[in-house]
Amino acid sequence: MAAKDVLFGDSARAKMLVGVNILADAVRVTLGPKGRNVVIEKSFGAPIITKDGVSVAREIELKDKFENMGAQMVKEVASQANDQAGDGTTTATVLAQAIISEGLKSVAAGMNPMDLKRGIDKATAAVVAAIKEQAQPCLDTKAIAQVGTISANADETVGRLIAEAMEKVGKEGVITVEEGKGLEDELDVVEGMQFDRGYLSPYFINNQEKMTVEMENPLILLVDKKIDNLQELLPILENVAKSGRPLLIVAEDVEGQALATLVVNNLRGTFKVAAVKAPGFGDRRKAMLQDLAILTGGQVISEELGMSLETADPSSLGTASKVVIDKENTVIVDGAGTEASVNTRVDQIRAEIESSTSDYDIEKLQERVAKLAGGVAVIKVGAGSEMEMKEKKDRVDDALHATRAAVEEGVVAGGGVALIRALSSVTVVGDNEDQNVGIALALRAMEAPIRQIAGNAGAEGSVVVDKVKSGTGSFGFNASTGEYGDMIAMGILDPAKVTRSSLQAAASIAGLMITTEAMVADAPVEEGAGGMPDMGGMGGMGGMPGMM
């Protein structure tokens, strides 16, 4: 086992604070509308220029192992805030630095670290409650656009696109961010249910210009098995041919004689048909077929339920107003399923989300909810260079998370004003003097974000804090224009969830660091240790002539 270095007490905390300050100082310069850029070197390719706090934090690794531990713990603050609300990483880092530096001063002055932590926790709980009281619902498109704009560093186009996407696919809809091909940002909305399976044969294509299969008012056959026997399909095909409507077959697979017959009948014009593979794999495929059945008002033909294709009733077929299939995707628009059955299914999936512990499963379940309840919107980010593209994509991702958080828990006045207003409504008292010091230092730290926003904008932080404190309600400092006024009226809003999560993450890690009494790290390996001994030069070569 490698030798370890151990530090105790004040010397451990001092080292830790150095690391905290290095990381936080690099991250906090990005805060606010006038936040500065940070340039990050990459081992391969061009450097990255970013204003995203968590991207800066992730890149920082310090040489000194004790200092690095401090930096990594603050990095955890940014990650926690990002995981909970998807934004607010820089605010969380600024708050953590303020609480930690004040807290460690108090510990050095001889105060009880555990009481300080209890005081910080009490103050945090009181401020969180005050933020929740300040929150106003964020329901209209204008407010959503304003939140998106603020989070995307005052990029109004991004805010507008996110609001438009939410309006079109609903609050439950899937909104994804992709790299676009041009200079302009674009919004692409897919209405209806889309899944990533294309046609099984190009001979099904009926729109040669777009290379797609398009069906109006089709019948939809859903089968939970592989179809390769034509005899199984014949009864259904005869019924469909009589109806004169097109048929879409969604099955585990369609191959061999069955697929060949479908292709031949389609080419001859006997009836219009197309086949696609069912989405997903294993149990997820079964669940998604059931989703499709509920959406289209049909039934899954499953041998597990004692059903077979030969005996399938025409009433088990689903319907939709339109189906569009290309090489990679199938879109079912306006399925005939009842709203009540769709809502019941959505509630059922949401219950699964609540009980699931796997991030991957939760993501897939949320996608299913979105496909049933809303739709899918893709924001395509445009930029002039690859560097700009990466930076902008990060900002759009942040803005998207912020707007979702705003819809979830409402909005508060932005620019650090919500934390300042929370101070005036908090009346919490500790059980002893050391707890009161913890409460006081945590409340004082609430001023740190507005000081930093003002400082990054070239204003004097203390002057701005005093002026904002003298006002009431949503009166604050607009760092973008350098003016004071009503933040909500000016459209400067923060999601309450982001502000709350930032504070809770900062207080949690700060409490742990203040109560740290010892640090253990690998001792540095001395240069040359464990290598081969010195050979002492090569003697005895004296008589050789010099080489030209």
From Swiss-Prot:
Intrachain S-S bonds: none
EC number of the protein: 5.6.1.7
Stored SUPFAM superfamilies: GroEL apical domain-like, GroEL equatorial domain-like, GroEL-intermediate domain like
Family, as annotated: Belongs to the chaperonin (HSP60) family.
Subunit structure: Forms a cylinder of 14 subunits composed of two heptameric rings stacked back-to-back. Interacts with the co-chaperonin GroES.
NCBIfam families assigned to the protein according to its UniProt record, in alphabetical order: GroEL, PRK00013.1, PRK12849.1, PRK12850.1, PRK12851.1
Protein's name in the database: Chaperonin GroEL
Underlying gene: groEL
